[in-house]
Each structure stands twice: as structure tokens, then as C-alpha cells.
Amino acid sequence: MIGLDLQVRPAQPSDHQALSSLIFFEAHVHRHLDWRMPLDWLESPYFWVAEENGRVLAALACPPDPPGVAWIRLFTHSGGIPAAWAWSNLWETARGFLAGQGGAQVGVIAQQTWFRPLLLDSAFELPQSIVLLEWQGRPVLMPELPFGMRLRAMTADDLPAVAEVDAAAFTPFWTNSLDSLRRAFPLSAYSTVLEADGRLIAYQLSTGHTLGAHLARLAVRKEAQGNRLGAALVADLILNIRQRGLSRLTVNTQSDNRTSLSLYQKMGFLRTGEEFPVYRFSVD
């Protein structure tokens, strides 16, 4: 085992190769479900490495996006050092830095079991999970849209308004920033909006794969919820999938989002059994 004389410092662009090796070769690599690759954050001041004798052995990145919400975008460490040692050194630095910048809500979608005890030992709370649902191929009817409402393809020019819809539909912890949406849009396979009198009311953004699609985001302004607008966007997406000869559609949502779960279940989605805990920590 390495001597454990770890020094934590801000990550630098010159660390790119060492970090790439850690991410590629090591068994313990946590990556956030994101539109950006972990090393895209390398120039962020919220990215640190732990090294011994100039050798990078661990890394953590948690840049706030949107402001005030810092997801753990990356945590990885060499198999030559204990996970708890790497985490405690890096998390102590990150927590102190976040506090000095005014604080943040820190979140982790822990897909891998090895990471979860470290978070609980650091007093992270576990208020909810992400659950996966899959459409079972049942035909759906397109709900009638309210008078004056129009469904159309999303364009890049819509993105600032799309970000407004997103912020109006979700709490800050779950909001997608404009920068995130600008990265997501070119990667989408099918994205649509609902508008009335030139104002965007709702949107969906989906990605594609060989067998079907994944509904990555569905948002409806709070004041317009309850009018089956979300159902209309999902029904249109299902129609698009069927027209392309595809048969699979998946979606993730929060385990405690009853409105969302009810919508998807009514439209023929069933839970797959996959579930990922969401841990939170408030840095004041």
C-alpha cells in the first residue's frame, strides 16, 4: 500500500492524462449522469486531485450548475489507496471551499454500491431515489390540446425559453441550467415544445439508441400542470418512435414524484426494478 502522504490541490489541465488513466483503469469511478464528460470540468476551481510524490491517486469534482447546486460529477481513486482515505481528504477540501463560496446543496446519484457507505459516513442524507421505467408498447391516444396550444419541434433559439420552463417546473436541486440544455440539445434525437401565444409552456427532450429512445427531460410550467400537456408530449414521442419502427422507450424519475410516476404508469410505463439512491448534503 502507498504511504498515504496525500496532498490535495486544485486540478490543472496538465493532469488530463493522469485523470484519464484513473477513469479508464480504476474500478472505483463515480461519474454523474450528465451531458458533459467528467474532464470537461477540468478548468473549474471545484475540481481537485490528491497526489503523492507528484503522482495523482484520486480526484473529485463538484462544480455548481446551476448555481447553488453542486453534484459530485467525478470521484475516483487508485486501487492502491483506501476509498475512505481518498474520499475524506478530497471531500474535506471540497466542503470547505463550497462553504467559502457561500454554500451549496451537494447531490450524488450513487449508481455503484461501493460509494454509498462513504456518503453515509460523511452525514449525507438519503431522501429519495431515481427509478427507471420502460414503456411496454401499449398504444396511446394523443390528448386534445387546449385551444391555441401548438406542439412543434424544438430549435436552438428556443433554449433560453426552455431553460425558463425548466426552472419554473422544478426545484433548483433538479433544474437544468441553460448551459446544460445547450449541451443536451445537439445530442437529442427528438425534442419538442408546446407553446401558446408565442410563449413556451412545456417541452420534452429525448435521446436515441439502437432499440429505441430515452426520455431525458419532460417539463411543464407549474401553472399549466394538470392539463395533460405532459401526456401530449409523451404521446407524440411514442408516435414518433413507432413511426421509426422502434419499440423501446425508457425514462427516469424521482421515487417521490407521484405526479410523474402516475403520468408514466397511465401511459403504459412499468418500473424495471432499477433504482439509484440520491444522496444530499447541505453546505452552509
Regions found by a protein language model. Give the residues of each.
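Acyl-donor-binding surface of acyltransferase catalytic domains
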Residues: 66-68, 78-147, 275-281
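Conserved hydrophobic beta-strand within the GNAT/NAT acetyltransferase core sheet
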Residues: 106-109, 215, 249-253
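Conserved active-site alpha-helix within GNAT-family acetyltransferase domains
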Residues: 110-129, 227, 231, 255-273
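Active-site rim helix/loop that mediates acceptor-substrate recognition in acyltransferases
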Residues: 23-53, 61, 169-201, 205
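Conserved acetyl-CoA-binding loop-helix of GNAT-fold acetyltransferases
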Residues: 82-96, 220, 226-239, 243, ...
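Glycine/small-residue-rich hydrophobic helix-like segments
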Residues: 181-244
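Conserved donor-binding loop and adjoining core beta-sheet/short helix segment
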Residues: 24, 34-92, 96, 204-216, ...
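A short beta-loop-alpha structural element at the N-terminal edge
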Residues: 5-19, 150-162
